[in-house]
Amino acid sequence: MSKPSLDLQILTLPDNPGVYQYYDKDGKILYVGKAKNLKKRVSSYFNKIHDTAKTNVLVKKIVTIKHIVVPTETDALLLENNLIKTLQPRYNVLLRDDKSYPWICIKKEPFSRIFLTRRMVKDGSEYFGPYTNFKMVYTILDLIKELYPLRTCNYDLSQSNIDSGKFKVCLEYHIGNCKGPCEGLEPLEEYQRQVNAIREILKGNFKESLKDFKKLMNNYAQNLQFEEAQKIKEKIEVLENYQSRSTIVNPKITNIDVFSIISDESAAYVNFLQISHGSIIRSHTLEMKKKLDESDEELLELAIIELRERFQLMSKEIIVPFEIDLGENIKTTVPQLGDKKQILDLSIRNAKFYRIEQLKQLQIVDPDRHVNRIMAQMQKDLRLPVEPRHIECFDNSNIQGTNPVAACVVFKDGKPSKKDYRHFNVKTVEGPDDFASMTEIVYRRYKRLLDENQPLPQLIIIDGGKGQLSSALKSIDELGLRGKVAIIGIAKRLEELFYPGDSIPLYLDKKSETLKVIQQLRNEAHRFGITFHRDKRSKAALNSSVESIPGIGEKTMLTLIQHFKSVKRLKLATEKEISAVVGVSKAKKIVDFYKTN
């Protein structure tokens, strides 16, 4: 891959947290790193000479950059940890298992112990985490210890050992940190109830535990132990802000493949995440060019078969966004909530980012090709005789007929041409009559273009349904432009497209780039019109207000309108601020007027 191609990969990286992977010309992994902002972090490698020769050698070898987008920087840290262990890149300091992030373990044994560990032992015990913040782990363990007096000893508390009196209570019992299950002083059922409550805390369900904390806090307060009550309050706040699990890693999800798909009119993008032993170890996105009108279901089935064969995937369960048929030997899961749904959402997010990057690269490498493709697609979708290189869209704005205005926005080659935007004060219409207003402004716009011998658009879009379109057509007919300029109306509720003389609207695919361009035009016309209407209302209100002030003439009124823009700003201004605009004498009159009115 050439250097410009590498620059292009960097340029189109997202500004999101994630993990990046560097590969050499032979496709071998060189380095894995995490980033709060992928684009900034990766760019930094190529924008300077590094202090170490090793890093400079690494940069020279990089040919391909891959990345995985994740929700947070913490998730990036965890995923980096997993990928370094799995891929063992040459330029990374390899992370060994005894350097892993810590977990909280609920031991599978009578009177379960709860403790911090770096190793997961497959003995039926439960593990929660991993945690990147050690302070948070110790805070949680301290909370558990304060709220629930559990044992910390390593005794084998089988019923026979307890009955035989093999063990004696220790100091923890005497200072109130343990209820003495080793001597049978605490029933197993009561102990298990506390373990269940702790399990809910670690799962993120704090309701019952928070009730217990608040009860403890209130008891301290009633006993005038305000310092202790404050400590519990602070721990409640920590617990409420705590998120107990990573969306990237969950030990209960193991040996599962996740597939998601997003598509547009011409292509589909299938992302694949491989989960092994509770961790993401691989991510890949496959682009599929559509040849016919294939459904997402058909494309996803084809992609899954291709990816499973390419990467020799043997998992018996896959997570997908909708039901598909892959035969009896593969279980498909369509999660609606929980950890599996979060991982599916992450896969979808990576597919979306991949598509955005591909489109960005196309725009940078060959911007004309990108525009030409959209224009050709619009001509086809809208059944136009020519490509709509010049489009104009109209929108009316008025509130109960007051200050009626209209806006016309212009797009050229699919992009806003703001220097060509125009707004109109409606002159010939009385009251709230949007249809008559549309007739007037369309006539004025194209009468002027014809008089000045200016180029006409290839497409006119009217914001509104059949009624608004019919009103615009009156002017088009009067000017003799019927058949010379294409004109359509768009109804907001269902995004229906109406054509002259056709009672049945056209519905475009919601993913259609054509529809997106039309929606952008409509929204821009609405924004431009509303802004103009708001300014006009403010000036009208200020004009009316200033006219009522004795001793203030038309010239002063105009000066005030130009400076303060609205009545509210004029009323809030100090006498000194007003005098700087119109003089001391007139400023006093204005301030006195607003004090009494």
From Swiss-Prot:
It comes from the Bacteria. Keywords: Cytoplasm, DNA damage, DNA excision, DNA repair, Excision nuclease, SOS response. GO terms for biological process: nucleotide-excision repair; SOS response. Pfam families: GIY-YIG (PF01541), HHH_5 (PF14520), UvrC_RNaseH (PF22920), UvrC_RNaseH_dom (PF08459). Residues 15-93 form the GIY-YIG domain. The keyword DNA repair applies. Residues 207-242 form the UVR domain. One of its GO terms (cellular component) is cytoplasm. It is found in: Cytoplasm. GO terms for molecular function: DNA binding; excinuclease ABC activity. InterPro entries: GIY-YIG_endonuc, GIY-YIG_endonuc_sf, GIY-YIG_UvrC_Cho, RuvA_2-like, UVR_dom, UVR_dom_sf, UvrABC_protein_C, UvrC. NCBIfam families: uvrC. Interacts with UvrB in an incision complex. The UvrABC repair system catalyzes the recognition and processing of DNA lesions. UvrC both incises the 5' and 3' sides of the lesion. The N-terminal half is responsible for the 3' incision and the C-terminal half is responsible for the 5' incision. Belongs to the UvrC family. This is UvrABC system protein C. It comes from Flavobacterium johnsoniae (strain ATCC 17061 / DSM 2064 / JCM 8514 / BCRC 14874 / CCUG 350202 / NBRC 14942 / NCIMB 11054 / UW101). The gene is uvrC.
